[in-house]
Amino acid sequence: MSEPLLTVADSLKDRARAALGSRNLILVGLMGAGKSAVGRIVASQLGIPFIDSDHEIERVSRMTIPELFAAYGEDEFRALETRVMKRLLKGGPRVVSTGGGAFINERTRRHIIKGGVSVWLKADLDVLWERVNKRDNRPLLKTENPKQTLEGLMNARYPIYAQADLTVLSRDVRKEIMADEVLKAMIEAQKESAAS
């Protein structure tokens, strides 16, 4: 009896898993970029755990993100986020989705860079707005003109997100396609690293 042939999908997963090794894969980007949705699929494809850092922050604080912002302000929230990210990134491999501001905080960014492979899910304003406009749980968008606020966040944060190890364009396609593109970006980065 012959061995079953590997499918292209199996091969992609195996090569991406080998490229990751024992490191963490950390997804960064603005709210609505798809970090959690894509992260869950990537983790499943790689056969490693997925952790949403915002959910972990809510678990340890026993408060929602909006409650934390209201009670303690953004600075205290960012300090807690840094502590949680530092702890999450000690183990591995795993896929970690971050809150939109995590990579912007210099201390948190250092932990992310040291803790694994960072992937920026980069989306344009219209894609982000379409996704975040449907929910009312975004503390930073509680303004008179939330779309303009989102654009301001893009302008301020995109140069910092660009420091991530890899960039994958987040657009209006199925999450599974985005997950495959993350895997392909990891494989390509490993090839380039091996060639240099």
Swiss-Prot record:
- Record's cofactor remark: Binds 1 Mg(2+) ion per subunit.
Q: Name one GO biological process term.
A: amino acid biosynthetic process
Name the pathway it acts in: Metabolic intermediate biosynthesis; chorismate biosynthesis; chorismate from D-erythrose 4-phosphate and phosphoenolpyruvate: step 5/7
Q: Which domain of life does the UniProt lineage start with?
A: Bacteria
> Which Enzyme Commission number(s) are listed?
2.7.1.71
Q: Locate the residues binding ATP.
A: 32-37, 138, 174
Cofactors: Mg(2+)
Q: What GO cellular component term, any one, is given? A: cytosol
Localization: Cytoplasm
What PROSITE patterns does the record tag this protein with? SHIKIMATE_KINASE
Supply the enzyme class, top level.
Answer: transferase
| Binding-site residues for substrate, renumbered to this chain | 54, 78, 100, 157
UniProt-annotated binding residues for Mg(2+): 36
Q: Which GO terms describe its molecular function?
A: ATP binding; magnesium ion binding; shikimate kinase activity
Known catalysed reaction(s)? shikimate + ATP = 3-phosphoshikimate + ADP + H(+)
Family annotation (InterPro entries): P-loop_NTPase (IPR027417), Shikimate/glucono_kinase (IPR031322), Shikimate_kinase/TSH1 (IPR000623), Shikimate_kinase_CS (IPR023000)
Instruction: Indicate the family of this protein.
Output: Belongs to the shikimate kinase family.
Function of this protein? Catalyzes the specific phosphorylation of the 3-hydroxyl group of shikimic acid using ATP as a cosubstrate.
Q: How does it assemble?
A: Monomer.
Q: What is this protein called?
A: Shikimate kinase
Q: Which source organism does the UniProt entry give?
A: Rhizobium leguminosarum bv. trifolii (strain WSM2304)
